[in-house]
Design a protein with these regions (language model features):
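Non-catalytic macromolecular-recognition regions in eukaryotic signaling proteins
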Residues: 19-192
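Sec-dependent bacterial lipoprotein signal peptides
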Residues: 1-19
Length: 192
């Protein structure tokens, strides 16, 4: 009975997930938060243009409230960011993860404001699954049967401090609705 009880306790301990500190996952003395104030929300796939975020604010926070950085060794240079997409309308086809370069400096315990940074290039909007929404392709998403595609996106920034320690930001998210503004219910009826 004693061995059985020990085995049950060990299984229970192994099954319980451990707590994690996302800000502690990098060796840097800072962590970066992302605040997205204005999101595009609506994207007309009939107009070839990149999807951009009007304003994002990156904020640097020292992990230890008792720490200071008078020499600026915790100043962070952001080199790249990755955008991941997922469907929220029941469909499965999404564009591949997008990786963009950037050269943004975030002072230790300071902020940097990013304006009009892209999250989806024009070439991705003109490819699957968005191309199905264009009139000459039927104007309907084949997976859902709808004239629109609902998608969420996640953005994460990567860089290093002036001291060379890697930094990964928290992940921020948003939502997008893709439609072709030129496709109306009447224009779809004519094609059938």
């Amino acid at each position: 009975m004693k061995k059985f009880l020990i085995a049950v306790v060990l299984v229970a301990v192994a099954a319980v997930p451990a707590c994690t500190n996302k800000q502690g996952e990098t060796e840097a003395p800072v962590f970066i938060t992302v605040n997205i104030q204005l999101q595009p929300g609506f994207v007309d796939v009939g107009t070839p243009a990149p999807v951009q975020i009007q304003t994002m604010v990156l904020s640097s926070h020292l992990k230890s409230s008792a720490a200071s950085d008078p020499q600026g060794f915790a100043t962070t240079t952001i080199n790249t960011y990755i955008v991941h997409f997922r469907r929220t309308d029941g469909g499965t086809r999404v564009p591949p993860d997008q990786t963009f370069g950037c050269g943004v400096t975030v002072p230790s315990n300071g902020t940097a404001t990013l304006s009009n940074f892209p999250i989806l290039p024009v070439s991705a909007i003109q490819a699957a699954p968005f191309d199905q929404l264009l009139p000459f392709n039927g104007g309907v998403d084949r997976e859902t049967g709808k004239t629109e595609i609902h998608m969420a996106w996640d953005i994460t920034f990567f860089g290093q401090t002036a001291a060379g320690q890697r930094v990964q930001s928290e992940t921020a998210s948003g939502g997008l609705l893709f439609v072709d503004a030129a496709v109306t219910p009447e224009s779809r009826k004519v094609k059938r």
